[in-house]
Amino acid sequence: MFSLQKKALQHIYMTPENASELTKDLLQHLGLYWNGPIIKMDTVVYLHNKIFSNRSVLKYALAKQANITIIKTLVLWVEPEYALAQALKHNRKDVLECIFSYHLTTPKYHHIMHLTSSQELFEFFHLFICKSKNYNARMECLLYAATLYNFPNILEKNREYIIRHSIGNSLFAIACKERHIHLIAWFVTAGVLDTYDDSTLFNTAFKLGDYSLLEVACDLPIIYPDYLIISMMQTAIQKNYFRFFKKLLTHFNIYRQIIITDAAYYNRRKILLLLLNQNIFNNFAILCALSAAIKGHASKKTLNLLISQLDSQMTVVDSVYYSIIKYNNIDCIPLLMQIKTFKIETLISIAVHGNNINIIAACKAFLPKDTLYHLVLKMAIVSRNYKLFKLYTEKENPMYIFTTIKAIISNLVNYTVVQAVAIEYLRKFHQERQLPIVPLLMVLAEHNYITKFKKTCYAANMSDQNVKRALIKCLFIASQKNYCQIFKYCFGSLLKVLSKHERVKFFNSVVFAKKLASYYDHQNMIHLIDSLIERFRYLIKD
């Protein structure tokens, strides 16, 4: 095999018009090695046992800058689109002219325009393929294509046309979509946009997840309003784009409470760590973020991160408690117990008001039983939540509950309205469980509920020795606390049921009651006892 390439390229070979046979001279012009005859058959060129497709031959010819006459023949052997594409790739305007001369009516080939790197060739190619006869339509088509395929020189050349016909914004949208960074910067700085929306570039960057677009938006000579940057930071938090958030934070240096709150809510621990390391946010802001983290059911690591940043003496804000209740976040309670000022009693109080049984049940692990029941029943009474009251009393020991409510009633001395509710709940509970009457009588006498006391006595078995003893005790309570009506009612009730033998002891009890009244200087009670003794002395003596 030997090469005839150099010698062959020195001669111009005219291909026969029918182009039915590819001779050795043509092969030499193409820059190939010749070692035998070659024949064109349909779309394949045969060289003995070697096969070259027409496309390969054309591509090779263009690469070796073969004679135009040869190339003109080859472009007839391939599809027009392929021929155009290869001509664009090799920046051959002469080949394009040849193809267009063969194909006077060509379909739209906009999709291959980008194959050329030459601005001149791009415009020339567009001139042939654009079908519109209207100048403005052709120009707009060219500019859209130039934007689509990143030809800034064409846009700069036609800058005045873009401004005059107000097509800058639509072209800018294409540049953003295609991520042409230099074009985007040109649109913003060239003054071709009618109304530039500051958020457009940011929104596109987030939509496409393109960090380079965000960098362009940040580096443009534009003063963005704070609300826009905050909004973009929130978007970065929601999408968990850490790089985007860090770029916005470091570039614009904007810190707001809503940012750390959102980061906590969406459980973005890396972003939270970045924010907290700046030492910008105070305890209140961190507490608000903690509340948001509870609301969003953030991970334990996120909660611990926020808790570790708090001052141990910082008072826990109500929003933290309300978030636990409202969003039923039980898992965070053990973690919050690390904060010295976190009060489980406050949490239970709010849970009772919110009727959140799950939270109340979860608090059992952190309080003694007596404290828990006292607190829950008290709050149920205060909030008039009889359903909760019944839930926590129906399965417990009745006397334990009775004793607990009795203690609650004693604590509500200064709250007469609430105390009255507690007494009513106690009476209902006493009636439902059919407890002994004596403890209830003592409680009613202790707190001077005369009407309920009378009703209870009326329902009691007055001949029962326990009831009699209870009424005598009630005499002492009444004299000690100056409850004249209670004393008078107990006195009259006992006279009716006591035997003659018992009346002597009763008289001694009345005398002792008078001494108690004297000790506490209850003059009204003393006068009452004296009058009762005088009035009923004959009964007592009998």
From Swiss-Prot:
Keywords on record: Early protein
Keyword presence, Nucleus: no
Superkingdom assignment: Viruses
Description of what induces expression: Expressed in the early phase of the viral replicative cycle.
Keyword presence, Zinc-finger: no
InterPro entries xref list: MGF_505
Family assignment from sequence similarity: Belongs to the asfivirus MGF 505 family.
Function: Plays a role in virus cell tropism, and may be required for efficient virus replication in macrophages.
Protein name listed in UniProt: Protein MGF 505-11L
